[in-house]
Amino acid sequence: MKLIVAGSTGFVATEVIRQALSNPSITSIKALARRPTAVPQDAGPGADLSKLKSVVCDDFEKYPESVKQELAGADACIWLIAITPSQLSKMPFPEARKICLDYTVTGIETMTPLASTPFRFLYTSGANSERDATKKPWVLGDFCVMRGQCESAVLDYAAKSQGKVQPCIAKPGLIDAPGKTGPFMSIVQTIGRTVIGLPKVQRSEIAATLLDQAVNGIEKETLLNEDLVRIGGNALAGSGKTGE
């Protein structure tokens, strides 16, 4: 199968690509980002590096024809372009909204006509994202509602696609990995777990889940953190690997 990984230079995307390189069901990986995507470290002896193609797109609001040609015929897209809560302070909220919502809508609208049928579109959101604006969380409320709007946009587009698009919304809590948690991040994660009540998932688990759903089919449209841990753990166990 041909897989698009959008936002391919990011923290989770790097692990998605690393695992995908060793997945025999995936024959082509288009790594879509603003800058070139490097081969992940520790790809492993079973990795087929020839499957990976870096696709640079300078403007996610308007895809040039050269980029569209690279994406054509894809069977699935794992969408990992977003602004995290820690990045919010570095930009105006309208800019964060554009990156999270507008880029996603333009992406699915651009890819779908070019893709195979069915086209599995996996959008990575967050555990506290809220589709119902009347239930706005008390922490980062506007951000959580905006991310919920992104989820709804993907689901609404898929519902109107006459079966062309099979959507999946992944809602992870805190994403952890070996070596990531220094003193500052330990404090942040403690606050996230105790104050906000965020669950935790390993980076290897969410990556394995996204790949499993892209290759084998969508179990359900919304995957909560507990689903990511369960599916990812089973997928890693089946491949003989362990979670990070």
Predicted feature residues:
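NAD(P)H-binding glycine-rich loop region in Rossmannoid oxidoreductase-like domains
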Residues: 3, 31, 46-106, 110-113
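Oxidoreductase cofactor-interface core, primarily capturing Rossmann-like NAD(P)-dependent enzymes
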Residues: 8-11, 16, 39-41, 129-244
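Acidic-histidine catalytic/liganding microenvironments
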Residues: 23-24, 49, 157
